[in-house]
């Protein structure tokens, strides 16, 4: 069996890591997007359908950057499917999460 030993000297610093590097990502999994951050009929939804209560909590967490889309969802994602008129966007099988992706929320909506 192989062993690895790591020693960290907390008195030695190379430099400071900018706090803006710490971010998060949004993945189309479960209720993260649909009925999560995006729910047009929710009482706190803005004109783009994003929930104000969820966005407020994200701001309180201090997230400085959000990658969209993220996670395993991107393994089958084509950015062109999430732009243009929503009614003309293709519905596709999401191979990562075994569901149907409606592309109701895409890059156009997220970047607003």
What are these regions (language model features)?
Residues 1-112:
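Non-catalytic accessory regions flanking glycosidase/transglycosidase catalytic cores in CAZymes
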């Amino acid at each position: 069996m192989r062993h690895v030993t790591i020693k960290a000297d907390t008195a030695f610093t190379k430099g400071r890591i900018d706090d803006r590097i710490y971010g998060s990502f949004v993945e189309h999994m479960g209720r993260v997007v649909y009925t999560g951050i995006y729910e047009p009929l929710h009482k706190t939804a803005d004109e783009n359908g994003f929930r104000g209560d969820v966005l407020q909590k994200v701001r309180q967490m201090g997230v400085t950057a959000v990658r969209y889309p993220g996670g395993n969802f991107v393994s089958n994602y084509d950015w062109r499917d999430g732009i243009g008129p929503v009614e003309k966007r293709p519905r596709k099988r999401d191979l990562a999460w075994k569901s149907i992706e409606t592309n109701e929320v895409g890059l156009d909506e997220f970047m607003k």
